[in-house]
Amino acid sequence: MPIPVNKPKNAFEGVGAGQTATARIGVGMRIHNLMIPYSGATLAQIKEIRVIANGQAIQRLIGADVIDAVNQFDGRNAANGIIVIDFERFGVTLRGPREITCLDTTKNPKIRNVITTVSVEVDIDGAATNPVLGTPQAKESAMVKEPSELMKFNRVFGYDPQGSGEFQIA
């Protein structure tokens, strides 16, 4: 199996307080995770991150602080200037299951729904003083024999506990 390597991607466009920054991610490889360097804004001031493939949001993540909390729960270090968005199952020790759950943008003829475009949108709060998003890095690997058609799909399910009784958070 090919060894994953970190590759820089296109820089963000439209970075500013109260703006939506966009970066286009190249296709043709299997993307394991995406690392976004940031400064000039707190994690709470990075309001929403969307990963868009073929014009459809495949991951909609509310707040970099939530991403950081999930990453710490999974065993990663706290985001110290770098936000990590996982496409593969982090913590899986076997290479096969990790490979099958990553974002596959290869041109494998066995894949029914080929991903032709990938981009990342980041909403920055207007209270951020001088936000800077560095060039994102992607951990990628080349195509292997079997296609990866499983995808980690993060969605937000809104729930307002204010008017309800007791509830359990799991």
Role assignments for model-derived ranges:
Residues 1-170:
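Beta-strand-centric surfaces of beta-sandwich/beta-rich domains
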